[in-house]
Regions:
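Extended, charged low-complexity segments
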Residues: 143, 148-151, 155, 159
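Short acidic-glycine loop/turn motifs at beta-strand connectors
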Residues: 10-15, 29-31, 98-102
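A basic- and aromatic-enriched beta-loop-alpha substructure that forms the phosphate/nucleotide-
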Residues: 69-118, 122, 131
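Compact, glycine/acidic-enriched structural inserts
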Residues: 44-80
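Short, well-ordered loop/turn elements at secondary-structure boundaries
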Residues: 1-4, 31-32
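Short beta-strand scaffold segments in enzyme catalytic cores
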Residues: 5-9
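Conserved small/polar residues in nucleotide/adenosyl-binding loops
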Residues: 163-165
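Short, solvent-exposed aromatic-acidic interface loops
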Residues: 20-47, 113-114
Length: 165
């Protein structure tokens, strides 16, 4: 069974108080989210949490609109969809990628158990959850859909052979 998840991208000022403590849950920042990206598979922290940590380390600073667009580009695969609201579709895990001047944190919530799992920096997530898995190497330009340029070249060669070029 798929472990469905939703990724939100939210400005940091809506999630933390003046002491840097998180004060938000997904429903409280729903209207401030620039992105609600549904991912049908692998939502558990050991995969999606680490994937997002790796992505954030490769993309540490950018404005929120650009971060949202790039996250969709880099995370897209054939079972991912954009929704108008975090509550538009059933999913177990909700991730919030916080974007701002001071914050590089990611939060994870388990909706089925009404539980806050973590709010951590990317390195803290990797330390706690990384396992021996074939994570996407965003720092080397990989995306979830295209793991390396060799695949793209092989696909191109296949298409070209079909049209006899």
């Amino acid at each position: 069974m798929a472990t469905r998840n939703m990724i939100m991208v939210v400005p940091e000022e809506y999630g933390f108080n003046e002491h840097g403590l998180m004060t938000a849950v997904p429903n409280s920042v729903e209207e401030k989210s620039y992105l609600n990206l549904y991912m049908h598979h692998d939502g558990y922290p050991e995969w999606q949490g680490v994937q997002l940590a790796n992505w954030r380390l490769a993309n540490p600073t950018m404005d929120i609109a650009r971060a949202s667009a790039k996250l969709v580009r880099d995370m897209y695969y054939d079972s991912s969809y954009l929704y108008p609201s975090v509550n538009s579709i059933d999913h177990q895990y909700t991730y919030i990628v916080w974007v701002g001047k001071e914050n590089n944190k990611i939060s994870c919530f388990d909706r089925y158990n009404s539980k806050h799992i973590f709010t951590m920096t990317p390195n803290e997530i990797k330390t706690k959850y990384a396992d021996d898995m074939d994570y996407t190497d965003f720092a080397k330009g990989e995306t979830r859909c295209r793991r390396n340029n060799t695949i793209a070249k092989e696909e191109l060669a296949t298409y070209l052979s079909l049209i006899h070029i």
